[in-house]
Amino acid sequence: MCPTPPAAPEGPEFHIDGASKGPPELTEKTVSSPTPHVVETTTRSLLHLSAYVSIFRYVTEGVLYERPVDRLEFRTSAPRTSLFVTQGENDTIIVDLNHQRFHIRPANTRQIIEIHTSQGDDTVYIASAFKNPFHIETGAGNDTVITHAKKTNILTGAGNDMVLTGSGRSYVNTGVGNDIVNVSGSGTTSAYLGSGADFFRGDAGRVFVDGGKGDDLIIGGQGHNILSGNDGDDLITAGPATNVIYTGDGQNIIDNLKASDRIYTGSQITSISEGAYTPDKQIGTVFKVTSQPLSETGLIIEGSDTFTERVQDDLRLLLGSDNGHQLLRALTKSIRDSKKPITIREFKHVRNGLYVPTLNDGTAFAASGKPGTRTYGGTVFYNPTYSESEDVPLAALYHELCHAYNFVTGSVFGGMSPDGHGGTKSAPMVNNLELQVVGLPCNIEPFDFDDDPATPARVTNPTPYTENALLGELGLQLRKTYIYYAND
């Protein structure tokens, strides 16, 4: 389904310079604190205002960002929006929005092009493989979003939505409704389908999909698939390559399983073989995971309704994960022992996660082979759209929860060690507290995490409490370094 972009309108056309700062009377600066004791400044410039359309440029600066975050935001209040984005001359972007045409010259290829529509049945079509990243929010309504951009974040909100992605890298969150997500091409996709009876089909690229609450139909693609049914009676079809499947709660049916596939479940599996349903027939490697309900973890989620539902889906997957349920069990024990909750809070635009302990005075650091003081509670800051390389956003959340584990158990490693870099560059020094949650070795005296002489002391976190433990379980590439090296 590829709509044809409209012909040039007969009316006036608008030219927008994405690098413009706007006149002083249309520019304002705001100062905010996304985390305790951290300040950031956002400059907002109004670049265009016409019938149903406003265009703003936002530039956010602060210590949390390697460089300023530059966003060019299109916002339409039309009751129904048809928006087509095509490639113009000399790296310009042409936006046809209902009966208006905009010629956009982005500030640079890093500038994020944001599109926000109002409530209604909207269509957004990104027709070209743009270098600029796109962020699309369509709001409530039965919306259609098609993208061929190299990187796209899509949030469709409530409604029965349809999303089609191409060969780029896509993050999709369709929210409440009976939604369809279809991947076409080699792009990597992370999709959260939210509540409803949803349909998902993968293609050649790596796929991560979480069906959310509801009875879903999930079909893996030709690449590596991570398929999570979540709550509901789901039908999951494994792809022809490698598959890691989390059934979630419900009466689930799995089709096309192979001996190489891994299935994590707390209930009986029903598979389809030659058209017949076969209860509890084991094909592939099955891991039985029994865990506590989400409501009993003691974790608190703060943010929008969309963020809350999204994090709940992440946590339900982790509760059905071999490594994840062990991490959450340890954190739940700390919450019950101390009566101090761990909070997960929404983090926007930051290409990272963060854990802030309730007390960071160094007393939680292990020393001379002895644990430090247990520092309970704390806050995890989580950007649910952020991931690096071939990773999935869930890995960033897991990384920060592993930091929480070290603080609540008094097992934080002090000092620094060389990053485990295997390329041509010399390894820089990295804080041990980061290396240990990735699962990389630290140059320290081995530490006995469980105070059990029968188990070996370690120079990194035990397996369930590392990001690499989750990546390995998901079938993704392990991190060999803490720092992401772009050209090595």
Give the ranges of each region predicted by the language model.
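GD-rich hexapeptide-repeat beta-solenoids
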Residues: A8-E13, E66-V95, T188, T265-S291
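LRR N-terminal entry segment and analogous cap-like coil->beta motifs
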Residues: N98-F130
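Glycine-centered beta-turn/loop sites at beta-strand termini
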Residues: T117, I126, I136-T138, T147, ...
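A metal-dependent hydrolase signature that marks the N-terminal structural subdomain at the beginning
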Residues: D255-G353
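Active-site scaffold of zinc-dependent metalloenzymes
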Residues: V350-A395, A404-V408
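Catalytic Zn2+-binding segment of zinc metalloproteases
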Residues: E400-M416
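Active-site or metal-binding loop neighborhoods of secreted/extracellular toxin and effector enzymes
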Residues: V412-D488
